[in-house]
């Protein structure tokens, strides 16, 4: 399980270290994919990506919608590894998609992490916090 918010700066080669607590889960590799409907990058441990892939295969959604979802997730995904220092290099297409410049936020989101440009994250975090309690109340049936 991933949680927490971590701030980093990209080095001159576009790399940043993943938080030490996250690295062991990513030792076998990770998949980077564009956030669906959000200007961020999703980072899944390989085992979680496989689970997602399998769950999508068994989903009963209209074929045309499923093709679109598969294109959005899989066609633009990258299989990457951390370097010996635990750093991650963001592929240029995903970096551009998420608008990542120098400062990045790594946010733990249960079974995956999200990578955001710092400025974009601040806006999203505020919006998420404002809606979180409303969502919890809905889940609790209040």
From Swiss-Prot:
Its main location: cytoplasm. GO terms for cellular component: cytoplasm; nucleoid. It is found in: Cytoplasm, Nucleoid. It comes from the Bacteria. GO terms for biological process: negative regulation of DNA-templated transcription initiation. The keyword Magnesium does not apply. SUPFAM superfamilies: AbrB/MazE/MraZ-like (SSF89447). Keywords: Cytoplasm, DNA-binding, Repeat, Transcription, Transcription regulation. It holds the Pfam family MraZ. GO terms for molecular function: DNA-binding transcription factor activity; transcription cis-regulatory region binding. The keyword Transcription regulation applies. Residues 5-48, 77-120 form the SpoVT-AbrB domain. Belongs to the MraZ family. Forms oligomers. This is Transcriptional regulator MraZ. It comes from Dehalococcoides mccartyi (strain ATCC BAA-2266 / KCTC 15142 / 195) (Dehalococcoides ethenogenes (strain 195)). The lineage of its organism: Bacteria, Bacillati, Chloroflexota, Dehalococcoidia, Dehalococcoidales. The gene is mraZ.
């Amino acid at each position: 399980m991933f949680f927490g918010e971590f701030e980093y700066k990209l080095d001159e080669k576009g790399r940043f270290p993943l938080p030490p607590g996250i690295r062991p889960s990513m030792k076998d590799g990770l998949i980077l994919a564009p956030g669906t409907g959000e200007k961020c990058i999703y980072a899944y441990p390989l085992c979680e990506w496989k689970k997602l892939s399998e769950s999508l295969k068994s989903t009963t959604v209209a074929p045309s919608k499923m093709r679109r979802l598969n294109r959005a997730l899989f066609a633009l995904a990258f299989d990457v590894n951390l370097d010996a220092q635990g750093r991650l290099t963001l592929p240029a297409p995903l970096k551009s998609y998420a608008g990542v410049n120098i400062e990045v936020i790594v946010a733990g989101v249960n079974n995956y992490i999200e990578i955001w440009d710092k400025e974009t994250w601040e806006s999203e975090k505020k919006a998420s916090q404002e809606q979180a309690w409303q969502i919890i109340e809905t889940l609790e049936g209040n």
